[in-house]
Amino acid sequence: MADNCIRLLHSASVFFCLGLLISSFNLLQGIAAENLSKQKLTSWILQNEIVKEVNENPNAGWKASFNDRFANATVAEFKRLLGVKPTPKTEFLGVPIVSHDISLKLPKEFDARTAWSQCTSIGRILDQGHCGSCWAFGAVESLSDRFCIKYNMNVSLSVNDLLACCGFLCGQGCNGGYPIAAWRYFKHHGVVTEECDPYFDNTGCSHPGCEPAYPTPKCARKCVSGNQLWRESKHYGVSAYKVRSHPDDIMAEVYKNGPVEVAFTVYEDFAHYKSGVYKHITGTNIGGHAVKLIGWGTSDDGEDYWLLANQWNRSWGDDGYFKIRRGTNECGIEHGVVAGLPSDRNVVKGITTSDDLLVSSF
């Protein structure tokens, strides 16, 4: 593998070589996970036991409840929703780590939904269906919010476009991906609007269907409406970066620029979160998940928390949202913060070529 990669690099096939390395990494990770937890993956999620243990724990700080979505789910089915793959170090090559001025005075509580109330996208709760597309949702939703905050334009960008068209550069689509790669993709390739390439069809089923699990959709590079051109619908990022893993830097980033994407480790008990400030109480480590962080505060019990929007529908959690302990790197949430700034090249104008010709020349 190493010799082949060296030869490929000398022939300028950098992206193909990187794809081989990432594919090999993911294959080894997948085999290890299957061998270590095959019995666990086929077992049922223990709703009764987990809900009881959390709610009877006086120090839990949060409440659990039965969730119909996971009523008859195996651990493997739950794991399909958790699409953050272990990110190869190569993905962070050249990615800056952003910190902020420590003299910036931050409020004790902050909610992006009220701070930028004109931006309706911030308060949207979506549903990723049975696809491990959380890495794409967290990125696309945060970038949509940032376009509104910076340019005063309400725009919903397409999760489906990123999921289908980023390919091996972002990971494996519905089988998981790398959050930072999504932000790098925005910078170099852009993403179309949801109107151009929707994630949900008109029956309410998740694209491409309502199966228990479904494959990554194909990249069409064509808007569903004949009145739009795919290239003209593109919106771009101007940067992609990691935020320094300190609560003050994360708060400053959200306060100045808007919601960010965060990745964290999910345990079985998280599936049953209902209210309060989450911290891991019981259950096995299931996988990595990505969501949108929109604010922070302190509970009545004095527990500092982050406020986040999940994409498991409003029937999950606290109307689709959850709070998690802040300042202790709970479940690794403060070590996986990525973001980027929107570009004023958000719409490419003056393109008169048909999408059919654009696809053939891409």
From Swiss-Prot:
Belongs to the peptidase C1 family. Glycans are attached at N35, N72, N154, N313. This is Cathepsin B-like protease 2. One of its GO terms (biological process) is proteolysis. One of its GO terms (cellular component) is plant-type vacuole. CDD domains: Peptidase_C1A_CathepsinB (cd02620). It comes from the Eukaryota. Disulfide bonds join C119-C148, C131-C174, C165-C219, C166-C170, C196-C223, C205-C210. GO terms for molecular function: cysteine-type endopeptidase activity. Residues 1-33 form the signal peptide. Thiol protease that plays a central role in plant programmed cell death (PCD). In addition to its role in protein degradation, may cleave and/or degrade a number of target proteins, activating signaling towards PCD. Contributes to the increase of caspase-3-like activity after UV-C-induced PCD and is required for abiotic stress-induced PCD. Functions redundantly with CATHB1 and CATHB3 in basal defense and distinct forms of plant programmed cell death (PCD). Participates in the establishment of basal resistance against the bacterial pathogen Pseudomonase syringae pv. tomato DC3000. Keywords: Disulfide bond, Glycoprotein, Hydrolase, Plant defense, Protease, Signal, Thiol protease, Vacuole. Its EC number is 3.4.22.-. It is found in: Vacuole. It comes from Arabidopsis thaliana (Mouse-ear cress). Induction: By dark-induced senescence. Induced by infection with an avirulent strain of the bacterial pathogen Pseudomonase syringae pv. tomato DC3000. InterPro entries: Papain-like_cys_pep_sf, Pept_cys_AS, Pept_his_AS, Peptidase_C1A, Peptidase_C1A_C, Propeptide_C1A. The active site is at C134, H289, N310.
